[in-house]
A protein has these predicted regions:
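PLP-dependent enzyme catalytic core of the Aspartate aminotransferase-like
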Residues: 119-123, 128, 132-167
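Short hydrophobic/aromatic beta-strand micro-patches
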Residues: 36, 106-108, 142-144
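Conserved small/polar residues in nucleotide/adenosyl-binding loops
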Residues: 1-5
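Short acidic/glycine-enriched loop/turn segments that link adjacent beta-strands
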Residues: 29, 101-102, 134-137
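PLP-dependent aminotransferase class I/II
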Residues: 14-91, 95-98
């Protein structure tokens, strides 16, 4: 667990910090997470927890992941570098990019967001349109490895160039 993100644990009596293994560890298919909380609250939650809610393989994978500090450090570095690259290049393409500390960015392209989403999807690049969240002109892109980020940027630049030529 990254301790710097839990500064108030123990100071605030009813604080619960939830973590998922989906993003940092790439274990989304296991549907696994954990909570850090005061012991009294953990005891209450254990009383109402479903039996066998996590299978033994998922549990073992989660425990192994928690011990892999090197992987966490490498992942944080890849995400940090990828975030900077995507922020810089999307901005250079005329997109408005919102600040982020997560493994994804929200941006508004200089063309219709839904059209860009569909064009990228046709090219095999999957991003998330944010219309269902009340932000129809914004998109969300997950930060991948360097190869994935460069592919996303190249195909986005291609779609934006084609749009400019036909406008």
């Amino acid at each position: 667990m990254y301790k710097r993100q839990l500064p108030h644990l123990g100071e605030i009596p009813n604080l619960v910090v939830l973590r998922t293994f989906s993003k940092m560890y790439g274990l989304a298919g296991l549907r696994l997470g954990y909570g850090v909380m005061p012991e009294w609250l953990a005891d209450l939650l254990l009383r109402v927890k479903l039996p066998f809610s996590v299978n033994i393989l998922a549990e073992q994978a989660g425990l192994a992941a928690l011990d892999d500090d090197i992987f966490v450090s490498q992942t944080l570095l890849v995400v940090s570098e990828g975030r900077r690259l995507l922020e810089r290049e999307l901005s250079a393409m005329g997109c408005k990019v919102w600040p982020s500390q997560a493994n994804f960015l929200m941006f508004e392209p200089p063309m219709d967001a839904r059209t860009l989403f569909e064009a990228l999807l046709a090219k095999g690049v999957i991003i998330r349109p944010l219309g269902s969240y009340g932000m129809p002109e914004k998109l969300r892109v997950s930060i991948g490895n360097e190869e994935e980020n460069l592919e996303f940027l190249a195909k986005t630049a291609e779609v934006l160039r084609d749009h400019d030529r036909h406008s």
